[in-house]
Amino acid sequence: MKITTGQFNDSYFPIMDGVGMTAHNYARWLNEKYGKSMIVAPKGNDYEDHVPYKVYRFKSVLLPGMNPYRVGLPLIDIKFKKKIKKVGFDLVHAHCPFISGQLALNISKKLDIPFVTTFHTKYRDDFKKVINNDLIVDFLVNFTLDFYKAADLVLVPNKATGLTLEEYGFKGPYEIMPNGSDMIVPEKLKLISFRKKGLKMIDAGTDEFVMLFVGQHRWEKNIRLIIDSLRQLKLKGKSFKMVFVGEGYAAGDMKKLVRKYELQDNVVFLGVMTDRNELQKVYAASDLFVFPSVYDNSPLVIQEAAAFGVPSIVVRNSSSAESILDGVNGFLIENETADLTKKLMALMQNQHAIKIAGEGARKSIYHPWESIIDDVYYRYTELIKFHKPSK
């Protein structure tokens, strides 16, 4: 059964965040295996799309204080409205509850088709960052809950994310649909080649201890914890290289902090990397993936690192830690600078422990998107077959 589906999200290329990558991989694999799937998202400046599926873009403006994110303006984009009206969707899937999500909901009502949404993000944290009023924050959280209540199917990427949704007050049913990875586990010779090229990219020696962070450069990601720990490592005379990949509003202040701590020789900022082939080389060159975020729900980057046998360090009891067993397929720390520093110092002296955890991560954490999409397609077709037209 071939189906036509739309993936709606407020972030998409050239923004390289986890939710945008999820929407991309849904569209990519559904389009390749099960019919037609397309992305509906805001325009990104003069960015040109080069993907194997259709992309429908609508006008947008930069979101103040949240660079590189944008606010979509589909209602005033006449050309976009004409184009999207001609698409015969069988089902629409929203990956956020805001502009593009509301657009998907409206389309589902007009066409009388199933509406699916995934709860990806801790929206209350986002609201609190820009709004210093608990009443308004509660109002916005309730607004998002109404959105999820309107869906025929609500998905979450893991158990912890579902619990967050319940904490917000959602009482309806939801299903776990895990995220996957578009990275391919490289063969041994390929991995060696990637590593050699990656070390050259970051100007690191073959025996240098390399740590990596990939993600939006936002303080919510707990990046300050990383930089503070790096300072402690430097004061203790440790040799290392820390690589940051990504962009975001905090990037400038992160660089200032690195200079303040005199870490310029130890830290590399590569910026956003849209070329996934180049990013593979950076993963391959790394010993550890350091991701202490307590904001993220089910970060794709941990799976990406696992594909290259690189274990992650995450905060104990965070959503990111749900699939990690300490020392088995990753490492757990308390949300403290001292504990991260202690763990890093111990692992610098124990490459065997890193290797064991890296192999465990590759076997238990990494899952290719292609297999995930088979399950997505099954649920989509069930919804389409048993959808009851509204009266």
Pin down the residues of each PLM region.
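Aromatic "clamp/platform" in nucleotide-sugar-dependent glycosyltransferases that forms part
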Residues: 294
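Short alpha-helical donor nucleotide-sugar binding micro-motif in glycosyltransferases
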Residues: 147-148, 272, 280-286
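Nucleotide-activated donor-binding/catalytic signature segment of Leloir-type glycosyltransferases, i.e.
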Residues: 255-273
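Donor nucleotide-sugar binding/catalytic pocket of nucleotide-sugar-dependent glycosyltransferases
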Residues: 41, 56-59, 141-193
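Short hydrophobic beta-strand element within catalytic cores of glycosyltransferases
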Residues: 302, 311-315
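N-terminal subdomain of nucleotide-sugar transferases
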Residues: 1-47, 51-57, 370
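A short, well-ordered alpha-helix in the C-terminal region of glycosyltransferases
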Residues: 353-367
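Conserved acidic donor-binding segment of nucleotide-sugar-dependent glycosyltransferases
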Residues: 326-327, 331-337, 346-351
